Amino acid sequence: MSARFNHLKADAHWQGVWESQGTFQARDDSPKPKSYVLEMFPYPSGRIHMGHVRNYTMGDVLARYRRMKGFEVLHPMGWDAFGMPAENAAMEKKVHPGDWTRANIAAMRDQLKRIGFALDWSRELATCEPDYYGQEQALFLDLYAAGLVYRKESAVNWDPVDMTVLANEQVIDGRGWRSGALVERRKLNQWFLKITDFADDLLDGLDTLDQWPEKVRTMQENWIGKSQGMRFTFVLDAPAGDLTSFDVFTTRPDTMFGASFAAIAADHPIAQALSAGNPALQAFIADCKRTGTAAAEIETAEKKGYDTGLSVVHPLDPDWKLPLFVANFVLMDYGTGAVFGCPAHDQRDLDFARKYALPVKRVVAPSPEEAAAPIGDEAYVGPGRIVNSAFLDGLSVEEAKAAVIARAEAGGWGQGTTVWRLRDWGVSRQRYWGTPIPIIHCEGCGAVPVPHDQLPVVLPEDVAFDIPGNPLDRHPTWKHVDCPSCGKPARRETDTLDTFVDSSWYFIRFASQPSDKPFDRAVAESWMPVGQYIGGVEHAILHLLYARFWTRALERIGRIGVKEPFTGLFTQGMVTHETYKDPAGQWLSPEEVSDGIVVATGAPATVGRIEKMSKSKKNVVDPAPIVEQYGADAVRWFMLSDSPPERDLEWTESGIEGCWRFVNRLWRITDVSEAGDGEDRELDRKLHKAIAGIAADIEALGFNRAVAKIHELSNAIEKAAPSASRAAAARALVRLVAPMVPHLAEEAWARLGEQGLVADAAWPAHDPALLVDDEVTIAVQVNGKLRDTLTAPKGAPKDALERMALESEKITRLLEGAAPRKVIVVPDRLVNIVA
């Protein structure tokens, strides 16, 4: 037997066997119970990175384990293949986005196969192919027919570099998430999906997702943002054009007596009316438009206002007037596009009031005695009683809210209502490399759906990327078609769908891929929902919320009988690495540094923080040469070891070397040529505890704990004398490690003379009787202090334990021949000698 595991030979051989035999192809008609394991599919950038490897290794271990436990497992792979990077590559490298994307897919597919993932490649899909996006177009039209899709003019986040619209979630600190350009606010006709129709259901459904991380559920709850409050009317003291009043929504009607101003959005009808002939206000509104529509950006931007010179009448006191501002922090598409400001109890309002010298009046205090306590630099947002508020004085905050709403409803100037932070999903993107929206615009008929028998609407190949913007707008023929309704000349919609639409249903298409429809309902329902979904927490709002909405929308129109797409969700940590700089402050890759020295120059390198691997800081480790040098199993083992999977994992050279040594150690341990005879009850017990414990750890995604148990069992097997028990333990170990180091396991399984593949073998069964220890450790105390420990048979009688304790060498020496006054025995736990 070779003492060293030949990973190069084994990896290639067994990967070929699995592929040729279709080992991991899931059968829709299998009589076995079904299990659907899925990692978030990747964007085909061209290279697999270590974050991918960690993510897919976790899912792979679970998928392989569940196969061994008797499940028919669906574990597919595909490509989230539309998006801006392909268009950027087209502009920079003069290559068609489709060619660039498909070449990247081929490269990444090969890389994934070299790591030995148990994937069903027969179900591979790419969202950029017409057989996928054509079915997406069919679903879009179904939702359109159901009234869940509409088009309207809307203020949007416009990226002037990528020349496309961004969703609020894609604007980070006022900049486009891909280009980094400062985002502008514009009005464009956009297509929307009515996600707000499902707001209550999306919120309520979070309570059923008990296998999701609490932080993800909280993030979605906050994003949906259900607010109970009051909608009421402010009357202007003078008209703005023909407008004399406007509505306001507030979640704090209890603080109305603390109001010191009212504010409206820059695109509010009153602001627009007042701007006519007012260059100063026009300039202010233009400045506001240079701020994106994302709430997070507006929250952090400097608060600015324009005093209109008008006032509004306070609805609780007709003699009380509040100045009206146009403000850059008020959004037209949240609430009513208007607010009242209560500086004492809202930090944003307080900052604004201090800037514009507006009154600050406390109306909530921890106690009545603090009614006159001044407000400093921080607004008071804590609990308390209402003060300085006429008929509300002395009430709690909730009592005051109810009282104001009751008075408003009785007076006819307001009513209690609910609003949501969640906005309808704008899905129009002004770019080429995306799913064409299957709508035709006709001057006479309006927006006309493309007939289903004319799908897919395929992207034209002959496009140019020599200037920014959408090539579909400039195409000489593609957009010119006849109206399906009246036959007159018309034009295609040239916007394409947000790529998050593509990822909102791919998991259903994996389950069923007929050529004539998006999926077969019965087949899809036999797999759905996904039992375990694995991916990064950065998708908590965007992808995961959209996928939950899309599945609900399909359920509403009768396409599928599932509402929640993912039963279990696991968000893994990142893979990190040290960062390095040369003396000039330039980033260096790990390959450019050796023992703290810049390889090229011999100069000392600066070792920086351990951070997420990123191209910008060059601390990326390419998995391909690591797999070549150490083998796929060593890389997989590293990804599972040490750190809990939900935490970050630091990549180190010493760590992968240690994993490679352990893989070779496993190769030696699983050789049972020296079988031996007889039983080793202690080893039997350790084996069966390991079988049960590793299974429980994998089910709980506690891979690092499973790895620790395999180390313990391996140590026990190595130390044990040759015996039948040792041989059995070594054979069982092969199956226990098979989900984690599958190439070694297959090689060892074949060496043992076993039939078939270990991938198809059953998980070892454990004997519950062997999980119970036959022996226990007894603490021996003298006058309450621990002095010795004993090993005794479980259930030993009290007199036997007392005798063993008194005969202990340590205890005999301590007692110095004196008889104890009393001996207290707690069976299986403790002997306490009172001297």
Swiss-Prot record:
<dbReference type="InterPro" id="IPR025709">
    <property type="entry name" value="Leu_tRNA-synth_edit"/>
</dbReference>
<dbReference type="InterPro" id="IPR009080">
    <property type="entry name" value="tRNAsynth_Ia_anticodon-bd"/>
</dbReference>
<dbReference type="Pfam" id="PF13603">
    <property type="entry name" value="tRNA-synt_1_2"/>
</dbReference>
<dbReference type="InterPro" id="IPR015413">
    <property type="entry name" value="Methionyl/Leucyl_tRNA_Synth"/>
</dbReference>
<keyword id="KW-0963">Cytoplasm</keyword>
<feature type="short sequence motif" description="'HIGH' region">
    <location>
        <begin position="42"/>
        <end position="52"/>
    </location>
</feature>
<dbReference type="GO" id="GO:0005524">
    <property type="term" value="F:ATP binding"/>
</dbReference>
<dbReference type="InterPro" id="IPR009008">
    <property type="entry name" value="Val/Leu/Ile-tRNA-synth_edit"/>
</dbReference>
<dbReference type="GO" id="GO:0006429">
    <property type="term" value="P:leucyl-tRNA aminoacylation"/>
</dbReference>
<feature type="short sequence motif" description="'KMSKS' region">
    <location>
        <begin position="612"/>
        <end position="616"/>
    </location>
</feature>
<dbReference type="Pfam" id="PF08264">
    <property type="entry name" value="Anticodon_1"/>
</dbReference>
<feature type="binding site">
    <location>
        <position position="615"/>
    </location>
    <ligand>
        <name>ATP</name>
    </ligand>
</feature>
<dbReference type="InterPro" id="IPR002300">
    <property type="entry name" value="aa-tRNA-synth_Ia"/>
</dbReference>
<dbReference type="GO" id="GO:0002161">
    <property type="term" value="F:aminoacyl-tRNA deacylase activity"/>
</dbReference>
<dbReference type="InterPro" id="IPR001412">
    <property type="entry name" value="aa-tRNA-synth_I_CS"/>
</dbReference>
<keyword id="KW-0067">ATP-binding</keyword>
<dbReference type="InterPro" id="IPR002302">
    <property type="entry name" value="Leu-tRNA-ligase"/>
</dbReference>
<keyword id="KW-0436">Ligase</keyword>
<dbReference type="Pfam" id="PF00133">
    <property type="entry name" value="tRNA-synt_1"/>
</dbReference>
<dbReference type="GO" id="GO:0005829">
    <property type="term" value="C:cytosol"/>
</dbReference>
<keyword id="KW-0648">Protein biosynthesis</keyword>
<keyword id="KW-0030">Aminoacyl-tRNA synthetase</keyword>
<keyword id="KW-0547">Nucleotide-binding</keyword>
<comment type="similarity">
    <text>Belongs to the class-I aminoacyl-tRNA synthetase family.</text>
</comment>
<protein>
    <recommendedName>
        <fullName>Leucine--tRNA ligase</fullName>
        <ecNumber>6.1.1.4</ecNumber>
    </recommendedName>
</protein>
<dbReference type="InterPro" id="IPR014729">
    <property type="entry name" value="Rossmann-like_a/b/a_fold"/>
</dbReference>
<dbReference type="Pfam" id="PF09334">
    <property type="entry name" value="tRNA-synt_1g"/>
</dbReference>
<dbReference type="InterPro" id="IPR013155">
    <property type="entry name" value="M/V/L/I-tRNA-synth_anticd-bd"/>
</dbReference>
<dbReference type="GO" id="GO:0004823">
    <property type="term" value="F:leucine-tRNA ligase activity"/>
</dbReference>
